[in-house]
């Protein structure tokens, strides 16, 4: 008798725990629908769909699995419809864009701060770092100064339509390559590869950023002849493009920067790449975006490139800006980068420094206002 009672109690407790778990999950989905999200007010085809839609769409994201923050996750039927219609409906608001450009230029002299020049620094001058303690310094050497341009590489440059290409996995299968290559000027981020992905990301590169840490991660700090050859061949493919090297963000880049300087001096005249070495630009850029209620530890490279593009481009189109682990068009899982190996899980390491969902929310709003065209759907 006693065993039967205990079994019944255990059964009841199990049902209670299951009910509580289901209630919590239901509340999560319900609250997410009530909260103002980053897109639009959702519309669903049938009663009861919102809750299940949240589970199937939201929980596909590794971001959601880890943080259970539904405000960033729901991909609704209305957004799917919007993605299909917006490319043809989007209209450039030139007046609003020019106003934004003026606002940016009030905070950032983009042309001047785009790169240090031979005339802007002297040998022995101590440079500080944007994101490191003021005690850390980098001394300008003769070799470093010799690599600086005589004038800003974007002085007196103007382009009609520019593409700023992020590295999000949303570009996988997008077939946006031809559209990107039709742009007058193409910005790329972090030396991202294009050769094996041309159908989706294009091949044209007019500028790519190069965080010094890339040398450690992909080229073994140039420690072997093979490493040096690989790096040389990668640079050769740029063929006249600007290599924008933010050497003064972190003091941890100092040693790698010196390795880079030695390499470029050694191969002087053998590469057509244009070198650009920005100084302490971020204090100015951060000030502008802070006024737009965006103040993470660090802005993403993508939004930094948008800032630079605003000074020389008459219209800016964005590709590969999507910080979530699922495709809004197909509901399929996505890698973090389009060039990640197949099966690579979506990473959330960026969360330590960046506010990518908040950046995306702002860019999406700018898209709606006609300031920039944000491509989230497939191009063909």
UniProtKB/Swiss-Prot annotation:
Keywords: Disulfide bond, Glycoprotein, Glycosyltransferase, Golgi apparatus, Membrane, Signal-anchor, Transferase, Transmembrane, Transmembrane helix
Residue positions binding CMP-N-acetyl-beta-neuraminate: 167, 190, 300-302, 322, 336-337
Parts of the chain on the Cytoplasmic side: 1-9
Major localisation: Golgi
Transmembrane domains' residue ranges: 10-33
Effect of residue 354 to A: Abolishes enzyme activity
Pathway membership, UniProt: Protein modification; protein glycosylation
EC numbers: 2.4.3.-, 2.4.3.8
UniProt GO MF annotations: alpha-N-acetylneuraminate alpha-2,8-sialyltransferase activity; identical protein binding; sialic acid binding
UniProt modification remark: Autopolysialylated.
Tissue expression from the record: Expressed in fetal and adult brain and fetal liver.
Highest rank taxon of the organism: Eukaryota
Carbohydrate attachment residues: 93, 113, 160, 206
Disulfide bridge positions per record: 162-313, 176-379
GO cellular component terms given for this protein: Golgi membrane
Membrane topology, Lumenal segments: 34-380
Quaternary context: Homodimer.
Cited function: Catalyzes the transfer of sialic acid from a CMP-linked sialic acid donor onto a terminal alpha-2,3-, alpha-2,6-, or alpha-2,8-linked sialic acid of an acceptor, such as N-linked oligosaccharides of glycoproteins and glycolipids through alpha-2,8-linkages. Forms oligosialic and polysialic acid on various sialylated N-acetyllactosamine oligosaccharides of glycoproteins, including FETUB N-glycans, a2-HS-glycoprotein (AHSG) and alpha 2,3-sialylated glycosphingolipids, such as alpha 2,3-sialylparagloboside and ganglioside GM3 and to a lesser extent NCAM1 N-glycans.
Family membership: Belongs to the glycosyltransferase 29 family.
Protein name: Alpha-N-acetylneuraminate alpha-2,8-sialyltransferase ST8SIA3
Gene: ST8SIA3
